[in-house]
Amino acid sequence: MTTDTLLSVKNLAITFSTSKGPVHAVRGVSFDLGRERLGIVGESGSGKSQTGRAILGLTAANGKITADQMQFHDLDLRNLSKRDWRKVRGARISMIMQDPKYSLNPVMTIGDQIIEAYREHHKVNSQEAKRRALDMLAAVKIRDPERVFNSYPHEVSGGMGQRVMIAMMLIPDPEILIADEPTSALDVTVQLQVMAILDDLVRERGMALVFISHDLHLVSSFCDRVLVMYQGHVVEEIRASELDQAKHPYTQGLLNCLPKMDGNHAELPVLTREASWAEA
């Protein structure tokens, strides 16, 4: 997959104002993103989701973003107006959230929601929009697109709901897809099915994928490159195929805490942390 740079982030920092003082959620994160699959991994609170949200301008109101650069093609994402953001979000950069129950509108049919997402960025009539929506539902391996099109979110399973979310986010044909733990609420079998669908669509469309996860196995299987985050910092950047050769002790510790499938039932080690890792 070509790695021509689509997005360049330099020295990104995110600080939240709270009643107990400032919280530094992201500190000095830098990376370039081409037409590839980039994984961002780390424990809860490491700053990985906030990094993804900052790319789309979705940081909460009490958060302050600073960066030396956040460049998407010729657009400076640090200085976009609300009007310009509406042209970027969904159309050029999309984001899949963790659980479709909280992302889909419970009082609209699935078809109406996908059509709305498509017509927001494309001036087409209702018949063409419906045709595109049904095609997109078929593309995410839904066997009966017409039935799901006319269903409400509560009438489909978790795995089906996540396929619907993938369809909705991809129908505008964005260049970058940010997937924030898109399978964490699903069982393992459905998880792999959804990831395989997502992987196929990203490859076919020549898109860039930012896959945010705490699951090292999943990231190593589906990504080209990995950023490992700890307390707001990127402590290691490594090719996914070489993850088992990680050099940073934090990444090594995460790998050592994974259960092995070789019959060794020894007690898993406790992950140790050094204060210096958060000062990098």
What does each model-identified segment do?
Residues L7, H24-V26:
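Conserved structural motif at the start of ABC-family nucleotide-binding domains
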Residues K64-D76:
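Conserved ABC transporter NBD signature motif
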Residues V219-S221:
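A short, surface-exposed alpha-helical micro-motif characterized by mixed small hydrophobic
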Residues L192-R205, H217:
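Helical segment within the ABC ATPase nucleotide-binding domain
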Residues D4-T5, R37, R143-R147, E237-A280:
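Short catalytic/signature loops enriched in Gly
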Residues I171-E175:
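A short, proline-enriched helix->beta-strand linker immediately N-terminal to the Walker B motif
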